[in-house]
From Swiss-Prot, chain A:
The keyword Ribonucleoprotein does not apply. Required for axonemal dynein assembly and ciliary motility in ciliated organs, including Kupffer's vesicle, during embryogenesis. Facilitates the onset of robust cilia motility during development. This is Dynein assembly factor with WD repeat domains 1. InterPro entries: G-protein_beta_WD-40_rep (IPR020472), WD40/YVTN_repeat-like_dom_sf (IPR015943), WD40_repeat_CS (IPR019775), WD40_repeat_dom_sf (IPR036322), WD40_rpt (IPR001680). PROSITE patterns: WD_REPEATS_1, WD_REPEATS_2, WD_REPEATS_REGION. Belongs to the WD repeat WDR69 family. GO terms for cellular component: ciliary basal body; cilium; cytoplasm; motile cilium. Its main location: cytoplasm. It is found in: Cytoplasm, Cytoskeleton, Flagellum basal body; Cytoplasm, Cytoskeleton, Flagellum axoneme. One of its GO terms (biological process) is intraciliary transport. WD repeats lie at residues 90-129, 132-174, 175-214, 217-256, 259-298, 301-340, 343-384, 386-415. Keywords: Cell projection, Cilium, Cytoplasm, Cytoskeleton, Flagellum, Repeat, WD repeat. Coiled coil: none annotated. The gene is daw1.
Length: 415, 182
């Protein structure tokens, strides 16, 4: 084994080692999820050196420099105020979801008008219109981090795979018997998982365009799914009140997370795949140990349905959005509520962190999006302008651009 | 509302819930009717660019009413909403005689849709508060409603503005959905 070079990953903080083994180029990541600007660097280097044979004594100085660079990046304060950069009168009917590619150079919007559009973030120009679906385009994703492909899931029961560069459709995946409402690429970008109102999830092979697996077992609609960071687990959240954990690629169900007393609205892994967070109409959010499938905490406090849940990129914070018009931030380790985000005048249906973890963005039926400090709960900015409720919102990786998609048929870029 | 609530309303409705699709040409008064049903303010209504959904309780039913924009360019998208429809309500501006042919054509096309086959249809002859409004009988005749044989149907004159006739129509809906749901 021979170390070739280091790659730096800012968010979540980590060092990627590129090395040679038996003539093959490989990579492995050293996660530094708890690194902060005040962490003792020499101690961290020492620990890494102990645990990682590729880091020899001669490399320690280099590693130290990398960690200092990460600390500098993490410590950067950003008091940016966003302004409305562009209104994209994108679609002739309401938007559904929006998503960025990894670099943030382009983003996509799905709509009731049966199209998905690809946009250039810097100019706000439309790059492609992906046409072919026969009903609402609901679930949309880039195959991040690559970003050269787009998957769209539609109420027409099909999923389509497109080239992000040319807008050409590679495959149409047929097999679901009801609306497709959620989808995800695995991190290797070899598979697409789709979840449907027909109560099943399916895995599709990107190369061949064939169905690889059907995951059956839920008793009601699947409305949320996500892969873990390594791609060997998939979780599906269902209106049957449960979440299933599936082994990939075997398709074996290894856990069913039972405990919620209402429909699931969202289910997410944290970065190191140790925890699963689930949000439910039963007004609570639960944390589960992903290894044994046991519930380790119930996060309470909301007075109405919890509509979305998300981890920050390091997995230290959990944020929930509720129909009660508030959002909450909890510590993933202490499970205590750290902050209550109050101010919206309608239900909050989407919540996300920026990659840096120092801002939260919420989308609400009160026609505004709001920016918050996750640690203090302070509302930093109200993004006003949409004339109807906001269905979706997203940060780019840099954290300096926001997009919002609304029922008012427009998408807005804020930066 | 949020996307998730839309998904919940997309499910085929349980026994005591009814999914109602409200269609008709632009300016027929669909949104006014929806707001009248929900007892909301009807003084500031603008053309619907997408859709509105409201749930109202009536005779032990929860009526989930989908009001879909009627402008010509978005009419091809009406079929996005056909799935799981229990009752179709078609709204006509009874005073806009110039567009009777157009509205008749749109209705005929809807009745031909496979996904709406057998679905009970209530036609609201709206805007009866206007002096120039054609009576329901004249509209029924002009639209050849008597030729509809593949489903139950009813025409009801009403004014979404004053509320007159609206409840009678909804009573018919509840009575007839009952038959179908059982």
């Amino acid at each position: 084994m021979r170390l070739k070079r280091f790659l730096l990953r800012y968010f979540p903080p980590g060092i990627i080692l590129e090395y040679e083994k038996g003539g093959e180029l490989k990579t492995k990541a050293i996660d530094l999820l708890e690194l902060s600007p005040t962490t003792d660097v020499d101690l961290v280097v020492e620990e890494i050196q102990k645990a990682e044979p590729l880091i020899t004594a001669s490399r320690t100085q280099q590693v130290k420099q990398l960690i200092l660079r990460l600390q500098e990046k993490i410590g950067q304060q950003d008091s940016r105020q966003f302004y409305l950069f562009k209104v994209l009168r994108a679609h002739i009917l309401p938007l559904t979801n929006v998503a960025f590619n990894k670099s943030g150079s382009s983003f996509i919007t799905g709509s009731y008008d049966r199209t998905c559009k690809v946009w250039d973030t810097a100019s706000g120009e439309e790059l492609h219109t992906l046409e072919g679906h026969r009903n609402v385009v609901y679930a949309i994703q880039f195959n991040n981090p690559y970003g050269d492909k787009i998957a769209t899931g539609s109420f027409d029961k099909t999923c389509k795979l497109w080239s992000a560069e040319t807008g050409k459709c590679y495959h149409t995946f047929r097999g679901h018997t009801a609306e497709i409402v959620c989808l995800a690429f695995n991190p290797q970008s070899t598979l697409i998982a789709t979840g449907s109102m027909d109560t099943t999830a399916k895995l599709w092979d990107i190369q061949s365009g064939e169905e690889a697996l059907t995951l059956s077992g839920h008793a009601a609609e699947i409305i949320s799914l996500s892969f873990n960071t390594t791609g060997d687990r998939l979780i599906t959240g269902s209106f049957d009140h449960t979440v299933s954990v599936w082994e990939i690629p075997s398709g074996r169900r290894i856990h069913t997370l039972i405990g919620h007393r209402g429909e699931i609205s969202s289910a997410q892994f944290n970065w190191d795949c140790s925890l699963i967070a689930t949000a439910s109409m039963d007004k609570s959010c639960k944390l589960w140990d992903s290894l044994n499938g046991k519930c380790v905490a119930t996060l309470t406090g909301h007075e109405d349905e919890v509509l979305d849940v998300t981890f920050d990129s390091t997995g230290q914070l959990v944020a929930t959005a509720s129909a009660d018009g508030t959002a909450r931030v909890y510590s993933a380790s202490s499970r205590k509520c750290l902050a209550k985000l109050e101010g919206h005048e309608g239900e909050i249906s989407k919540i996300c962190f920026n990659a840096q973890g120092n801002r939260i963005l919420t989308a609400s039926s009160d026609k505004t999006s709001r920016l918050w400090n996750p640690h203090t709960g302070e509302c930093l900015q109200v993004l006003k302008g949409h004339t109807d409720e906001i269905f979706s919102c997203a940060f780019n990786y840099e954290g300096n651009t926001i997009i919002t998609g609304s029922k008012d048929n427009t998408c807005r870029i804020w930066r | 509302m949020g996307l998730l609530s839309i998904l919940r309303k997309l499910k085929s409705a349980p026994d005591q819930e009814v999914r109602i699709l409200l269609l008709g040409l632009d300016n027929a008064g669909k949104t006014t009717l929806l707001k009248q049903l929900a007892s909301e303010d009807i003084s500031h209504i603008t053309p619907t660019q997408g859709f509105n959904i409201k749930s109202v309780q009536s005779q032990g039913f929860k009526l989930n009413v989908w009001d879909i924009g009627g402008q010509r360019k978005i009419r091809p998208y009406w079929r996005n909403y056909f799935e799981n429809t229990d009752v179709l309500i078609y709204v006509i501006d009874s005073a806009d005689r110039k567009r009777f042919e157009e509205t008749g054509q749109e209705l005929a096309e809807l009745l031909d849709e496979e996904k709406l086959s057998g679905v009970p249809v209530l036609i609201f002859a709206n805007k009866q508060d206007l002096l120039t409004a054609a009576p329901a009988s004249e509209i029924a005749e002009g639209l050849n409603l008597h030729t509809i044989r593949d489903r139950v149907w009813q025409i009801q004159s009403c004014s979404a503005l004053t509320g007159e006739g609206v409840q009678d129509g909804m009573n018919w809906v509840c009575k007839n959905v009952n038959a179908k749901k059982k």
